[in-house]
């Protein structure tokens, strides 16, 4: 990893965190309005769907098919989550599945030696953010994402990542300015809909890599340490049913039981019902039963 790449990742983690602290101070002093919360919510939903449905379920695992325009729109929205360019993100994630919780996994929390609290914390930190300064972007896209490399439109989305990041900050500023009629409204729109949104979405996503490989429940026979973490399911758009996902990586749905809330899966179903998605991968109850262990383990 180049020094410039490492510094960019460092800025991408620290700047949203500092902005979050500023937002907490403003919130404490009630300097926040419903407009700011609305801009934050809309931005979180759009870019969260971009990561969950676009980068992950569609582009990484090809769990459904859709029109080119929707593919590129989801890839652009995922880029505006500021978790890295699409080719690097997909390549890193495919490598994660190839070596899940073994040597070669970019962000496993289980590679630190020993089971003492210090080792667990070291692994947790590495999986959550530490890997961004060591492993992120190192997976060879020609090896791990040749399908996307062959897609000219996806290469354009990948190259325009820095500009999409800028757009993801300009839009909430513009929305705040237009809705409030003041530069201060633009600033608070940028703060909440830009930096706080990025901070929240980052750490929900990072928690899938860290928490969901350490604590939670298991239902299926699976050769890694993935876990389902129910309390993260809504904020993560269903990604926290992570053990289900590792058991059936190509499934369009991570929530496999009726009560396993999966907003990302609901979005895909909505696309399907409007004729905008097809070849949606579903895991039958019979296939699930064949892979189930005798009882769930924690």
Predicted regions and their residues:
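Generic hydrophobic/packing signal
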Residues: 5, 52, 60, 210-212, ...
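Asparagine-centered polar/low-complexity signal
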Residues: 9, 209, 243-244
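Active-site-proximal inter-transmembrane loops
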Residues: 77, 145-153, 215-241, 246-248
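Alpha-helical transmembrane anchor segments
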Residues: 183, 187, 191-231, 235-236
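Non-catalytic, topology-defining segments of multipass membrane proteins
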Residues: 1-206, 251-298
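Catalytic glutamate of the conserved HExxH
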Residues: 57, 210, 214, 246
């Amino acid at each position: 990893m180049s020094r410039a790449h490492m510094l960019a990742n460092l800025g991408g983690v620290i700047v949203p965190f500092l902005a979050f602290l500023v937002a907490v101070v403003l919130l404490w002093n009630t300097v926040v309005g419903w407009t700011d919360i609305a801009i934050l919510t809309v931005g979180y939903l759009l870019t969260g769907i971009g990561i969950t449905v676009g980068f992950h379920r569609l582009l990484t695992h090809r769990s459904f098919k859709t029109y080119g325009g929707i593919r590129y729109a989801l890839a652009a929205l995922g880029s505006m989550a500021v978790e890295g360019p699409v080719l690097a993100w997909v390549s890193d994630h495919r490598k994660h599945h190839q070596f899940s919780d073994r040597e070669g996994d970019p962000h496993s929390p289980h590679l630190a030696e020993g089971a003492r609290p210090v080792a667990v914390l070291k692994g947790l930190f590495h999986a959550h953010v530490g890997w961004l300064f060591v492993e992120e972007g190192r997976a060879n896209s020609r090896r791990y994402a040749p399908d996307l490399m062959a897609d000219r439109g996806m290469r354009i989305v990948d190259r325009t990542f820095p500009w999409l990041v800028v757009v993801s900050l300009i839009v909430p500023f513009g929305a705040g300015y237009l809705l409030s009629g003041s530069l201060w409204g633009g600033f608070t729109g940028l703060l909440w809909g830009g930096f706080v949104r990025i901070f929240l979405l980052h750490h929900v996503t990072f928690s899938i890599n860290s928490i969901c490989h350490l604590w939670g429940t298991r239902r299926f026979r699976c050769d890694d340490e993935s876990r389902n973490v129910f309390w993260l399911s809504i904020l993560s758009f269903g990604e926290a049913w992570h053990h289900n996902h590792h058991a059936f990586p190509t499934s369009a749905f991570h929530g496999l039981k009726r009560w396993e809330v999966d907003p990302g899966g609901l979005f895909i179903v909505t696309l399907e019902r409007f004729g905008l998605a097809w070849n949606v991968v579903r895991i039958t109850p019979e296939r699930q039963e064949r892979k189930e262990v005798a009882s769930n383990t924690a």
